[in-house]
Amino acid sequence: MKFHGSRPLLAIVLSLGLGVGCTSGDLGPTDPPADPQFGSVTVIPTIITADLLQCNPQRYISVTKVVGPKGGKIKVGSHSLEIPSGALSKDVTIVAEQVSDVTNSVRFSPEGLTFAQPATLTMSYDNCVSTAAQKSIVYTTDQLGILEQLRSADKPQTKIVTSTIEHFSRYAVAY
């Protein structure tokens, strides 16, 4: 004997069982832990709600530098990257580019290079349209699609924003 009406009932029972099994209390957002590196500035959590900051075009600049296990600092235009000691296991030829566009963005290569310890990226937005919103650094595609909003420290009085990065790619200033 076939029970044609039992499939919808089974689906309802399974849905209720899965719904009850998946609850684990408060699932709301939590504040990120305090980071002493950023001090008393505003820290922006990693939630992609950003738009790229509109700026007067930067001129294209390319800087090449070899950085090794001792670390080093690379300055490209008004932006800088500080790689700490121990972040790289061997000497690496790094290319930093300040990309000419209506957003402030930088691109680092070799693309995909990862660090054993995060590097600190500092970006200026002195040439950008001023907004009251907090600024952050975002990881983008080459077409400037935002992939990830990084936890950042905005210092509006000096018009710089700082974040740590764990790999090379393209980054831009957002709000």
Language-model segments: which ranges?
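Sec-dependent bacterial lipoprotein signal peptides
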Residues: 1-21
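Secreted/processed peptides and extracellular or luminal domains of membrane proteins
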Residues: 28-29, 59-62, 89
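Intrinsic-disorder/low-complexity, polar/charged segments enriched in Ser/Thr/Lys/Arg/Asp/Glu/Gln
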Residues: 60-62, 78, 118-120, 160-162
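C-terminal beta-strand-rich structural cap/linker in extracellular carbohydrate-active enzymes
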Residues: 160-175
